[in-house]
Amino acid sequence: MRIKILIIVLFINSCSYPEIIRDELVYDNDFETKSLLNIDGGGFKKFNNSTVLGDFNNDGFTIHLDNVGDHEYVFVSFDLYIHGTWDGNFNGFSENDKADKWSIELKPDMDLHKNLSSEIFTTTFSNSPCWPNYCLRQSYPQTYPAENNPKKGSFTTDIGDKLCNESFFGGPSTLYKIEKGFQSRGDAVVLRFYDELYQPNAIDKNGIPQEKCDESWSIDNIKIRVISYK
């Protein structure tokens, strides 16, 4: 009987989770003070009764954090606003069609050392309606090119009016509350947030490009934690 008990105890101990020895918040920015500390790129705007970083269109920003100390994982959480008429995995063009992609990338300038499966998260978003005969699907909450219905995983939909009230282009926004983790080593954390939007038809009747009015994104409430295990 004692042998059986010992075997059970050893089995339970062998299946226990690693002990967390460090879980530290190293960055926290809600942008209400309009601080660009540790940020390269971007400006501010008021949206949804808050100050946000954005809006971006075929653009992005980078967070550089030094002296964060030894760690094994980095976790980033944030509020992401998808503005306007994002089309997800397909824009519906018969030739040279492309997705509306959005990415977070760890250590974006170190391509020779990347394990792309763990150091970049690329997905798509769609604010399209979804009818039986028309539905431009998105990848989120999975990575591209997975297919899910528009706005899946969202926190709030149909927020506000167009960002450009006088423009034909654009539409309401969708809010996603996102957390992503990456394996990370060293004393620094560098994270790049960016999009790759495809909008060949975002041109008004006067021939003036309207890409940013048509589709863009903003971000708020960024928190970054580093974690180590025993």
Q: What is the meaning of each model-derived region?
A:
Residues D40-D59:
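Short carbohydrate-recognition loop motifs
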Residues H71, Y81-K98, P129-W131, Q199-A202:
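Extended, low-complexity, turn-rich repeat/linker tracts enriched in Gly/Pro/Ser/Thr and Asp/Glu
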Residues F93-H113:
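Short edge-strand/loop segments of extracellular domains
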Residues K4-N13:
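Sec-dependent N-terminal signal peptides
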Residues D55-S77, N96, D100-W102, P172-K180, ...:
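Short beta-strands within extracellular/lumenal beta-sheet-rich domains
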Residues S139-K230:
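Terminal, low-complexity interaction segments
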Residues V68-F78, I82-G84, R185-V190:
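Extended extracellular/luminal ectodomain segments enriched in beta-structured repeat modules
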Residues C15-G43, D111-P129, N133, K230:
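Extracellular carbohydrate-recognition regions
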